[in-house]
């Protein structure tokens, strides 16, 4: 029953947020296009529920041609970030197009962040912990408890804790904590 309620909540909330944020998202898309060559959106291959690969949209914050790896694995990440990209990442505005993924059911508002398709160690650890059964989220328990600063075992432990304890009240708490962290720009390293 919880999963059905969560899906309905996700759908309605994503629809409302897209309606409210539609114009600002169009402005962001225009700024991305004006400040660097290429499309406004970047579709990243991510690992979803039950390890199914899906395309996750983000506002493009890196130059076209950047290798599709986690930012911290790039030799010089700052050389790949567009003029507006650093701001988009620090403010988490680059994540807004993921509301589309929530709307179509590839993601949830709250759940473990979807791994990149080539993060084999994270994918294996999550599968071993049963976390792969969850729909990935725009935010999650690991996001509000360390975000980019956490090593993989700690992320997976927090994801597994969310799997065991998930509830509507925990989701609301995570959403509130996320809003607070975004406003304070906590835990963003790139």
Where do the language-model regions lie?
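Hydrophobic structural segments characteristic of membrane proteins
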Residues: 47, 97-190
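A helix-centric hydrophobic-segment signal that preferentially recognizes long
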Residues: 39, 67, 74, 88, ...
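Short, glycine-rich, amphipathic interfacial segments at transmembrane boundaries or analogous
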Residues: 40-80, 138-157
